[in-house]
């Protein structure tokens, strides 16, 4: 994980310029925000990075408090939102049952221990809380994988 963190810290200044896919998926994930019947007081954007999804969450839920969480300090510095916490997703700095809504865009594939990650998310979520995320699966970008296999 430390190598991933180092890479994100180094890339943060120019990340938005080359993150077309991340932004596109955040747009699609944000479309779900408009049909969710939840009135959250506190939202975590887990793996918020520079804030692609953060901005959309604030627009969808303007009365909520948004907390941007990322383990790459430099990415958080590029994020314009006020409440930012540099933290490990496996050890979120919140009490049990304290968060109404967690959103996360393309962060989970960087976490080798998904069980620990999900356990931690559900620990901080209120019983009626919601976790909305996007991630890559085994068939994601299969055309690109196939192309690389021909080159290799």
Locate each region found by the language model:
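A short glycine-rich, Lys/Arg-flanked "PGG" loop and its adjoining helix->strand segment in the class I
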Residues: 115-130
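A short SAM/SAH-binding and catalytic strip from SAM-dependent methyltransferases
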Residues: 100-115
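N-terminal, positively charged/glycine-rich alpha-helical extensions of SAM-dependent methyltransferases
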Residues: 1-14, 23
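Conserved alpha-helix/loop element of class I SAM-dependent methyltransferases that forms part
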Residues: 20-40, 56
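Class I SAM-dependent methyltransferase SAM/SAH-binding core
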Residues: 42-92, 101, 116
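Conserved class I S-adenosyl-L-methionine
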Residues: 130-152
